[in-house]
């Protein structure tokens, strides 16, 4: 039956900034289950899977808008302040969160990442308001802006890791991790779980931790800190 063999259309949705992260998993799943036709939609919002017909939605919002939805935790994500070596040569290296007040802190205009940068300091915290020298709603554009020396970008660790490893960016104020949150796969509850949905979620749970660990290992390597 359809619930035993993975086949048919698998409609996936994830935040725009996670598209590049997930593509190796999409390709790997496609190799395992070639009868499944994958439709991956990227956008800057959290859709309603029931209303919009998505089989699985990747989201950082674990709040279930509907009791007919199930959320499966996939791991934790975080963001880190980064800047290009050229920017730091010109403007100096912030040694403490308070030093960011004198820097061009670029703004993400995207609900998941919007707002102040909050650095916990014991019982207190340092709050930095990004300025309006540049804003974008896509993490990949923020990555390029940071690489080009436009200022300091607060980037998801998986977005920044390759540029950090290759020397195009330096991680600042390590080991601070900002915007730590859990990632979920959300899907409509059914009496039985369709094989393509079940196998995709199992594949995510199996593969994502190692993928996250690889990216985190790079950004947590003190050789790449400033």
Task: List where the protein language model places each region.
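Central regulatory/effector-binding core of bacterial HTH transcription factors
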Residues: 7-66, 217-219, 225-226
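Acidic, Gly/Pro-rich loop/turn segments at junctions of secondary structure
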Residues: 41-136
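Hydrophobic hinge/microswitch elements
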Residues: 127-171, 178, 217
């Amino acid at each position: 039956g359809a619930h035993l063999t993975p086949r048919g259309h698998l409609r996936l949705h994830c935040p725009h900034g996670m598209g590049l992260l997930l593509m190796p998993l999409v390709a790997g799943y496609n190799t395992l289950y070639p009868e499944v036709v994958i439709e991956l939609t990227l956008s800057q919002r959290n859709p309603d899977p029931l209303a919009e017909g998505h089989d699985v939605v990747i989201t950082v919002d674990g709040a279930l808008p509907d009791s007919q939805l199930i959320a499966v935790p996939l791991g934790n994500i975080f963001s880190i302040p980064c800047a290009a070596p050229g920017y730091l040569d010109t403007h100096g290296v912030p040694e403490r969160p308070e030093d960011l007040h004198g820097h061009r802190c670029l703004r993400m205009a995207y609900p998941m990442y919007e707002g102040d940068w909050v650095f916990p300091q014991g019982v207190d915290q340092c709050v930095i308001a990004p300025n309006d020298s540049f804003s974008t709603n896509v993490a990949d554009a923020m990555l390029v802006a940071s690489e080009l020396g436009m200022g300091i970008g607060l980037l998801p660790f998986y977005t920044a890791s390759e540029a950090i490893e290759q020397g195009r960016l330096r991680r600042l104020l390590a080991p601070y991790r900002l915007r730590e949150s859990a990632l979920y796969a959300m899907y409509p509850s059914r009496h039985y779980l369709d094989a393509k949905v079940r196998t995709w979620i199992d594949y995510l749970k199996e593969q994502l931790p190692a993928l996250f660990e690889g990216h985190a290992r790079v950004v947590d390597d003190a050789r790449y800190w400033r």
